[in-house]
Amino acid sequence: MENLVEIKYNQTGQSKLINEYGMREMQARAFEKRNSQYLLVKAPPASGKSRALMFIGLDKLINQGLKKVIVAVPERSIGSSFKNTELKSYGFFADWRIDPRNNLTTAGGDSSKVNAFVRFMESDDEILVCTHSTLRFAYEKLDDKVFDNCLLAIDEFHHVSADTNS
C-alpha cells in the first residue's frame, strides 16, 4: 500500500542537547520563567515536560521559599514520570527525591490516598505526587489556606474539568 501521508519535520537535534544544568532547550526555556506565579508548559510528548517541572519545583522549594510541591497527574501510570531522579550529576543543584509514602500513584485504596494527602499537608514533607482524583477529594477535606506557599502542578491539564464540582 502506498504511503498517502508522510510528514517530515526539520530535525536539527537541538532539542536533545543539554545545557550546563542538564536541561534540554524546552526545559531551559520553562526554567527561565520559574519566578512566574502561573506557568503553562505546552510541548510534544517525550519532550521533557516532567523533568522541566522537577527543575522548577526544586527551585521553588530551595530558592523561592515555597514549602511544598504537589504534582497531580490524570492517571497512576503517569506518576512514574516523577520518580526519584538524579539531576545533580548533570549539573543541577539538587536531585528530585520523593518519599515513597508521598507517591500516591501506586496501587491502593482511594480513601487511604486522601488521608495520606492530608497527612502530607500537615507534615514538613516537601514533594507529593497524586492523581487528579486524589487531589480533588483531598481538597474537599482541607482549608484553602494550607495550599499557600505550595506549587500545585497539574500534569496533563487538558484532562481537568471546568465544572465547579470537579
Which positions does each model-derived feature cover?
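Alpha-helical elements of the RecA-like P-loop NTPase motor core of helicases
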Residues: 80, 137, 162
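Conserved pre-motif I regulatory segment
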Residues: 2-42
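Conserved Walker A/P-loop ATP-binding site and its immediately adjacent core
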Residues: 50-54, 60-61, 65-92, 97, ...
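Inter-Walker segment of RecA-like/P-loop motor cores
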Residues: 91-139
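Loop/turn-to-beta-strand initiation segments
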Residues: 67-68, 123-128, 148-151
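Conserved catalytic network of the ASCE P-loop NTPase/AAA+ motor domain
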Residues: 62-64, 119-122, 143-146
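SF2 helicase catalytic motif II
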Residues: 132-134, 143-166
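Walker A/P-loop
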Residues: 36-57
